[in-house]
Amino acid sequence: MKETPSDMIQEISSSKLKMNLISKNSNPNNNNNPPSRDPSLINNMSFAHKPSGQRGKNSHNLEINYTSNTNDNNIPSTSTALLQKVVDKADILEIEIINSLSMSSNLKIEINALGMIQGSKRQAKDGLTFFGLIDENNIFDTNDKKDVDYIINTNEVITEENSNILGRHFCIRFDINTMKYYIKDLGCGYGTFKKIAKKAQIKDSYLLNIGNSYIVCTFGVDEYYPEGMVIPEGNKTLNIKVFSEIAQTEPHFFNPKQFKRIYIGRDISCDIIIDDSLLSRIHCTIEYDDEEGWIIYDGKIDDDESKNKLSTNGTWLYLIEEIPIEDGLIFKNNKNAFECRLINRNKK
């Protein structure tokens, strides 16, 4: 298994998430990245392993290794007998692969209350559908030998160094009480991110992905806060740390009394400027709401709504928490993008 390199630049720990963010010199002669057909949906975003890109001798290659207490041991399953009683009443969840470098686009996966309707590897009918990678030939000594329902194909050659991507990556669960489907990342492999359609409330230790860059959001005062600096609204202070392929930035601190609106993007007018070719000039906007707290929007938000504009490549939120699946939800895992549709059986 690949060890953490000595050039680790930062470790961020919380009760929910622990990540090692590593900046390494890239090999300019080694370009293993296949051409992306649509960078808005496919970033070369591999948490466990990321090939070096052809950028130059002074460039950096961002690699994120993370562990989380998120796993599949505490995901409740439901008996087949109970699920059989509601399967004809529940919506069908249709998941379409809308962009992929390793799987057929437009391929649709259908899930009902029992699980995958066709092609499940587990055939458990317990209301759970696990997506991930498995070591079918038992070559590697991995901790996770559990089966998955759907294998996420990858163009990567699995070696001892990157074998930690083997396992269950995310789970879709049907809840018999709410009659809804839920999705959650399981802390293995590449990370599962949902595309922010309108807005999202920022919570402590949230991880965001924009372009080839990652943003970690925390609240309050930490060891990076400038010594002697006045701390207005201390608990409401938003700390933002940006990690990108080029370099990591110094922490940014924002409090609601001084900042009505925060812009992040490539433009020099932004409060946080990131040198990332996949970002829009103003890629996302963060505002403070007295009731909801800090809120992030994709694209530019302006007092004049006619000037509002979505980003080209989207703003993505890591699914560290289980969320309900709504019709039209777009999420990604590895270099694959998926769109969810809910089909109402009872609709006439």
What are these regions (language model features)?
Residues M1-G115, S213-R281, E287-E292, N334-K348:
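Regulatory inter-domain linker segments that are low-complexity and enriched
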Residues I117-S205, I210-G211, N255-K335:
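Forkhead-associated
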